[in-house]
Amino acid sequence: MVPSNGAKVLRLLSRRCLSSSLIQDLANQKLRGVCIGSYRRLNTSVGNHANVIGDYASKSGHDRKWINFGGFNTNFGSTRSFHGTGSSFMSAKDYYSVLGVSKNAQEGEIKKAYYGLAKKLHPDMNKDDPEAETKFQEVSKAYEILKDKEKRDLYDQVGHEAFEQNASGGFPNDQGFGGGGGGGFNPFDIFGSFNGDIFNMYRQDIGGQDVKVLLDLSFMEAVQGCSKTVTFQTEMACNTCGGQGVPPGTKREKCKACNGSGMTSLRRGMLSIQTTCQKCGGAGQTFSSICKSCRGARVVRGQKSVKVTIDPGVDNSDTLKVARVGGADPEGDQPGDLYVTLKVREDPVFRREGSDIHVDAVLSVTQAILGGTIQVPTLTGDVVVKVRPGTQPGHKVVLRNKGIRARKSTKFGDQYVHFNVSIPANITQRQRELLEEFSKAEQGEYEQRTATGSSQ
């Protein structure tokens, strides 16, 4: 007996499932992989028994998802396709329009738009609106796709209609079964989709929103280091309800949408997907009232102040990261991070070039000619610098290790002193007479050298 195309595929799937060490390894972590049955069981199944491929539990214990391998029957052959024709909540809209953001929106914008709409459209807040729950589900579905980078990239590539059609069949990337020869279907792509989806659950960003601020520093504050208090607006846990979203003492009620299980089921072709209940967030319970201060969002917009330590040697446009002091997470996970970008003002005396600094020193005519000593400013105070006789404009001297200490290092840069010569615009009569005598003497020496050279 020659097995059908469907049987061949099922054989590959069962072997892949039973021999895969990856799923077994994941059992020791947060993911259980249970593959039940064999080729014989799969090939002869006539019921709707579902074999669990994997399950997932989030940090909070509320967000769970099971992907179930649906029932196969003996008539499953070469003409069956993974594509489906199921309806979609948003058949006439794209996900970006649902959330009211542009296609170039950043992750933070998408998250902000979602929380705003979720708060506005939550069924508990719109008990008189029969369409509120549907709208809430639309917003949640759009956010579920756009918050995940890989799903969003796929969505942008194939477009809304193609994505919805394929998603209704359970496999965003499948090509379906072709007539007779299989049409390019690769059964391993199915397991790739399963594994990818499962791992993506772990890779999804958790925590509150990151905050970015600018901080103005003087030149010396950047060079020597300092402490600054940064104040900014961000999401903060609601004080009224303690971040719970409901008034203290509010009684819990069993969620009617999921009957207290915390999960709802979606049937997509051969797949039965159980996902977190959108109404109760997987808790299995709801509340009769919500907090009036945060309107159930658990967080409110407020002002926050954080003390930031600036290391010595920072430079203009440097960005410092202060972990977990950003926006509060409505789900109760870790706060976001604070990113402080520095704007360092220019100094009237010092010019910076990496760890080195440059200063100008102005010499009088006589100092340049005769030499001597001058005082030069440094980062730690004035020092005396020797001027060689005959110093020309533009000459420089180097003061070793008088520059800036490099960040997180014990090494210092150098200081460069650039000499300029100041020519007086006004002089006294005596100074003129002396300069004229100097000029005559200089001219005489020149003529004498010329005459001596000619006689030779």
From Swiss-Prot:
Keywords: Apoptosis, Chaperone, Metal-binding, Mitochondrion, Repeat, Transit peptide, Zinc, Zinc-finger
One of the protein's GO biological processes: synergid death
Tissues of expression: Widely expressed.
Domain J: 94-159
Knockout consequences: Defect in fusion of polar nuclei and in synergid cell death.
Per-repeat ranges for CXXCXGXG motif: 238-245, 255-262, 277-284, 291-298
GO cellular component terms listed in the entry, alphabetical order: mitochondrion
InterPro entries xrefs: DnaJ, DnaJ_C, DnaJ_domain, DnaJ_domain_CS, HSP40/DnaJ_pept-bd, HSP_DnaJ_Cys-rich_dom, HSP_DnaJ_Cys-rich_dom_sf, J_dom_sf
Transit peptide, from-to: 1-89
Subcellular location: Mitochondrion
GO MF assignments: ATP binding; heat shock protein binding; unfolded protein binding; zinc ion binding
Binding residues annotated for Zn(2+) 2, in chain numbering: 255, 258, 277, 280
Zinc finger boundaries on the chain: CR-type: 225-303
Binding-site residues for Zn(2+) 1, renumbered to this chain: 238, 241, 291, 294
Pfam families: DnaJ, DnaJ_C, DnaJ_CXXCXGXG
Its biological purpose: Chaperone that may play a role in mitochondrial protein folding. Involved in female gametophyte development. Required for cell death of the synergid cells during fertilization process, and fusion of the polar nuclei during megagametogenesis.
Family of the protein in this entry: Belongs to the DnaJ family.
HAMAP family referenced in this protein's UniProt entry, alphabetically: DnaJ
Protein name per the record: Chaperone protein dnaJ GFA2, mitochondrial
